[in-house]
């Protein structure tokens, strides 16, 4: 073997040799070890012993940490598979409140009454406000979800009358079930098929291999706004789907980008509907964005609104106070001829397939659903034309408001909601404005509450329990009061270098794998060699 430290070794040959730290990372990836572990200090209050634990970073993207992304993808696949073809109703029945919980709420009622009396008399209520806040914390700590007052802020609403250009949806009686219809075959067997649905957005212009044929006529503004509000459109589609299906439809969905850089939806739906009904639901689904107009630019370049501590943002030339977010919406509500800023709809391309449990089609659909979960939405383009297309879309997205709190509203003469000093149009830190998201600020994976009757943490715990049982290791019961966890700062003398921690984790993983192989061989009646780990 050529020695890289040999001075006589040609430079060209040295450059072909792998770097040592790259070999460590490659070995860690091959063995499923997180390459960006987070150091946490664990203090055992029972024994007084303190040690450092390497916690996985939990990244979901392969570009950041392939092992963690792979584990997350496997976890999502298990979640999808477990809930898609359930045959029994998920039992989600809240427990009856116990005596202690009732007692706390009674105290809360007394405190609220006394506080209201003081407020009516014009007396200060600070002491009771603090007591009520502490009672609310105690009520939640006792195992009660939510807040006793519910929503306290008023919610702005508009007319719910449907648009004239949208077809009406059929009304069907709702059934208290999350399971779809059961079909009987002539031989007496029962089938309860489910569906795999793919929906896309509308066209913005002709494309060839994902690139606009004529960028000048391609509607980048519509593409950007559709991406920004795509998550709201999905919510509306689910509402309409349940209304037409006649039962509480459960779903597992993922969002990914098409080659033209427009988001589209893949949805595993429990139960089945006719394709005609699904097409009707898609045609009738839309989302209106009732925001102030942002088609006219008022401030740009060096001419930007200035901040005043008392009034908020002002016009730098005239000193005029810009309308606040609520004032802009009030003006919009008062205009009887007002039109929504944007209306987002699905496109005409719809794919709906019937899927039976335990078939190759079901396995293939689950693989397809999770195929791109480890990839960034803004995956690197493979050609210069595609990179130019992505750059043009990013330029439009840069100044499109993504939320009511987006600094880009200043560009159009409106103060963002909860305005604060330092806001600059074009520098929003929102998720939708990041290059890797291409305008879509929602979640990549959408799972209904009654899909598998388990949270993602519970699915993770199931996998952990299986591994511990296979290793023959007893699961230590959770003891919330025994350990105190704290992050370890970079440069802490107790924190070993990252390469040392990776080497230790690799060794530990190899030991676990050898133990697993021995247990599997013993179960199959084989004898593993102590040196090679292969069957003798």
Language-model-detected regions and their locations in the chain:
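Short helix/loop capping segments that flank catalytic or ligand/cofactor-binding pockets
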Residues: 73-76, 205-209, 276-278, 378
């Amino acid at each position: 073997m050529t020695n890289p430290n040999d001075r006589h070794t040609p430079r060209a040959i040295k450059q072909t040799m792998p770097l040592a730290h790259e070999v460590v990372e490659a070995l860690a990836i091959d063995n499923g070890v997180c390459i960006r572990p987070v150091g946490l200090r664990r203090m055992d209050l029972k024994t007084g012993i303190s040690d450092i634990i390497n916690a996985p970073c939990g990244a979901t993207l392969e570009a950041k940490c392939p092992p963690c992304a792979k584990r997350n993808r496997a976890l999502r696949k298990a979640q999808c598979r477990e809930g898609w073809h359930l045959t029994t109703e998920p039992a989600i029945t809240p427990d009856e409140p116990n005596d202690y919980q009732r007692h706390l709420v009674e105290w809360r009622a007394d405190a609220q009454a006394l506080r209201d009396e003081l407020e009516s008399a014009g007396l200060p209520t600070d002491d009771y406000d603090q007591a009520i806040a502490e009672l609310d914390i105690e009520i939640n700590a006792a195992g009660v979800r939510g807040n006793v007052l519910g929503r306290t802020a008023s919610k702005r609403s508009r007319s719910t009358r449907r648009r004239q250009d949208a077809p009406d949806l059929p009304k069907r009686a709702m059934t208290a079930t999350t399971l779809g219809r059961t079909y009987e075959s002539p031989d007496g067997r029962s089938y309860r098929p489910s569906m795999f649905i793919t929906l896309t957005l509308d066209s913005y212009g002709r494309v060839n291999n994902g690139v606009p044929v004529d960028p000048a006529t391609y509607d980048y503004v519509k593409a950007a706004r559709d991406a920004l509000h795509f998550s709201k459109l999905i919510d509306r589609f689910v509402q309409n789907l349940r209304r037409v299906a006649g039962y509480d439809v459960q779903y597992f969905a993922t969002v990914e980008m098409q080659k033209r850089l427009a988001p589209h939806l893949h949805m595993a739906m429990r139960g089945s509907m006719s394709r005609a009904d699904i097409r009707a639901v898609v045609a009738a689904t839309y989302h209106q964005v009732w925001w102030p107009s942002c088609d006219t630019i008022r401030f740009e370049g060096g001419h930007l609104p200035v901040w005043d501590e008392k009034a908020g943002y002002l016009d730098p030339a005239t000193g005029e106070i810009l309308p606040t977010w609520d004032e802009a919406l009030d003006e919009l509500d008062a205009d009887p001829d007002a039109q929504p800023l944007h209306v987002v709809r699905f496109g005409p391309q719809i794919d709906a397939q019937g899927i039976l449990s335990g078939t190759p089609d079901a396995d293939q659909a689950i693989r397809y659903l999770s195929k791109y979960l480890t990839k960034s939405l803004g995956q690197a383009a493979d050609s210069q034309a595609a990179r130019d297309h992505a750059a043009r879309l990013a330029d439009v997205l840069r100044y499109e408001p993504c939320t009511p709190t987006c600094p880009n509203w200043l560009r159009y003469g409106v103060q963002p909601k909860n305005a604060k000093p330092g806001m600059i149009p074009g520098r929003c830190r929102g998720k939708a404005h990041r290059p890797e998201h291409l305008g879509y600020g929602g979640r990549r994976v959408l799972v209904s509450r009654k899909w598998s009757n388990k949270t993602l943490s519970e699915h993770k715990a199931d996998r952990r329990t299986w591994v511990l049982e296979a290793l023959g290791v007893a699961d230590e019961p959770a003891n919330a009061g025994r350990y105190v966890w704290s992050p370890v700062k970079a440069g802490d003398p107790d924190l070993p270098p990252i390469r040392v921690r990776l080497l230790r984790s690799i060794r530990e993983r190899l030991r676990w794998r050898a133990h697993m192989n021995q247990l599997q061989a013993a179960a199959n009646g084989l004898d593993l060699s102590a040196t090679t780990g292969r069957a003798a």
